[in-house]
Amino acid sequence: MKNEVKKVVLAYSGGLDTSIILKWLQDEYNCEVVTFTADIGQGEELEPARKKALSLGIKEENIFIKDLRDEFVKDYVFPMFRANAIYEGEYLLGTSIARPLIAKTQAQIALQTGADAVSHGATGKGNDQVRFELGYLAFNPDLKIIAPWREWDLNSREKLLAYAQKHGIDISKKKGKSPYSMDANLLHISYEGLVLEDPAHAPEEDMWRWSKSPKDAPHESEIIELDFQKGDLVAINGEKLSPAGLLTKLNELGCKHGIGRLDIVENRYVGMKSRGCYETPGGTILLKAHRALESITLDREAAHLKDELMPKYASLIYNGYWFSPERMMLQALIDESQIHANGRVKLELYKGNVMVIGRQSANDSLFNAAYCTFEEDEVYNQKDAAGFIKLNALRFIIAGKNGRKF
């Protein structure tokens, strides 16, 4: 394949690994390289990536830096939160949900520039290789895919550094750079590697980059109100913001109060178990509020069906199937359930906790105090319950009369 590739679009961060990949592609494939850097809210200055690419011989017209923050939240994060998606009961899918957008945009740039190949920096052990490549092939099945970590022999940090030094690639560490393997976007930041590879070893406090420790969070709680329309967040404390602005604001609130830290061992799609630590402050608040709103606006059976389907939906995202027909089918059902998910939720934030203290919907609430009151009412005849119970017990009654014991 090396002689067949003429132009490749590389998912490029400007960091050491992808800079080495850039040079390796030039040397091994002797092809033209286009770099694509996505701004999905990782909180880093992206212009250095442009300068780094230029220093490695990339033409100015072959450098793409795109601000995808609003698209990321509006078209990926919000649809996922309509489903209340959680993988294996805990993980809010912060890395998983970012990969489809990057892959789609990378494939679009390949089409725009006439590139016949794409490349990424995911290793052969992780989930990201699957997520990226399923995304590429969903948009262009004819694209050639170059995954250097599955091809080269630079399989240690020492070999990577030696390669970088040999080719004049800057290997100086940024001041304050974490030794952990990290991935960040507007939804979360993740940490892997080093002491975390021992699941019995507690992470150091200085690992956490975003949030205060709950122990150091303010001693006073904070009350906030979130407004939703059709299941999506539209305002915080009455202030309407862009999708990216809303999630940024929620992150600020969550970090201030020590909300959203997670330490888990998860089952990777490729078959191994992996330990990761995550901070998802805004997403943790959003999930709690959205479920509270659904508690008054969704029909019982619709809510229960959603809960049954959610693990499948979450697994599809985790495993890289965002663009699959089955995910889109589930999304259509989920979105239909959100037509009446309109209203306001009041929350109290305090030392790592998110507590629902109120929920209301002017036109879509199914909560009717007249039916559920403990006081005297005129709308519900309690005698009707006897027949309801007897009908539901009929199979037990028949079995009992036949001598069957439970």
Swiss-Prot record:
InterPro entries: Arginosuc_syn_C, Arginosuc_syn_N, Arginosuc_synth, Arginosuc_synth_CS, Arginosuc_synth_type_1_subfam, AS_cat/multimer_dom_body, Rossmann-like_a/b/a_fold
Residues annotated for ATP binding in this entry: 11-19, 38, 121
Residues that hold L-aspartate according to the record: 123, 127-128
Domain of life: Bacteria
Biological processes annotated in GO: argininosuccinate metabolic process; L-arginine biosynthetic process; urea cycle
Pfam families: Arginosuc_syn_C (PF20979), Arginosuc_synth (PF00764)
Compartments in which it is found: Cytoplasm
Reaction(s) this enzyme catalyzes, per UniProt: L-citrulline + L-aspartate + ATP = 2-(N(omega)-L-arginino)succinate + AMP + diphosphate + H(+)
Principal cellular location given in the protein's record: cytoplasm
CDD domains recorded: ASS (cd01999)
Subunit structure: Homotetramer.
Name used for this protein in its record: Argininosuccinate synthase
